[in-house]
Structures are given as C-alpha cells and as structure tokens.
Amino acid sequence: MVKTYLMALVGGCMVMSLALTADASAGGSTVVAHVLSDEEAVELEIPTDIGVQKERLPLYRLGAVRYFSAGIGQVERTASYPLFSLKLVFTAGGKPFVSGVAVTLRQPKDGTVLTIPGEHNTGPWLFIDLPDGTYQISATLGGVTQQVNNLTVRRGHVITQHVRWAEDRSPALPAQAE
C-alpha cells in the first residue's frame, strides 16, 4: 500500500488530498486513464486494496483539438494515458515540474493558431491530441517564453517534448495562515 499526498493549486488555494494505492512494483497494479464517453474528462482508475478509486482530470477542447493536464503526484505520473499525439513536460530551474504554463501552437502550413491558457495547465504535463502536421510551440511561464520549432506529430504516435526554463518564474504559492 502506498500513501500518496497530492497537492495542487486550485483557484488560488492549495489543496491536498490523500490517495491510497496498491504498490505497483509489488502487486503489478496499473493506473489506467481513459477519455470518458461524454468527452468531459479523463478518468484515472486507481487500484487500491479496498477497490478501484477514480479520479477525473478536466478534458478541454479547442475546435477539434482535445487536451488535458496531468502529472501531479505519483499516481498521475505512473498512469497509462490515452494516445494523444503530443506530451509537453515543463521544468524550470531546480524544480523537476512546473504548472501554469500558457501554450500557443501554430501550424505554419495553414496558419492555424491554438492558445491554451495557463489556468488549464494545472500539472507539469500537457497532453494534446493534435492532427498530423508540423507545429511551432510557444510556452510562457512567468513572462518568459520558450520556443520549439518544427515539431512534427502523427496520430497514433506520442511525441514527448521537454520545455525547460533556466529559472523558476512560476507564481508564488499563497502564504498559509499559522
């Protein structure tokens, strides 16, 4: 049994929850994620010794493009996710993971522009189900933008692209009352 404490910044407040999960290394249990039939969320099925626990991650849509954010806590980092063509991983300074990154994708061939607000990016991973093509990506954290040019994606294949900032410029967490 693994006790995982998940912490997230939600609406300006730090939220902490506890997930009790089977130890995947001991029992071979796997956390599986799938898109719900109504396409409103990605649901994680987490095996525990008292049954399957479910967690939902919001699934957003911009036209025909779907995307969701994940990677907070051990459960989300070890899950098996649906095949979205692009996975962006955000890091900064000495922090292995950052969130709140605003992302703009451009397809130079036809001028398509998609903008994903930082508020939708609550974890260090951003999964985007893009149509086949070559894209330019701009990722902005704390006013500093990183560029990735000529990234080619194909449906059915996952491209993982790491985006790193030299310094951590993510917003400060709210002070906690004593």
Region spans (language model):
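Bacterial N-terminal signal peptides
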Residues: 8-19
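Primarily secretory-pathway and cell-envelope proteins
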Residues: 25-105, 144-178
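Beta-strand-rich interaction surfaces with strong enrichment in secreted/lumenal proteins
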Residues: 116, 126, 149-152
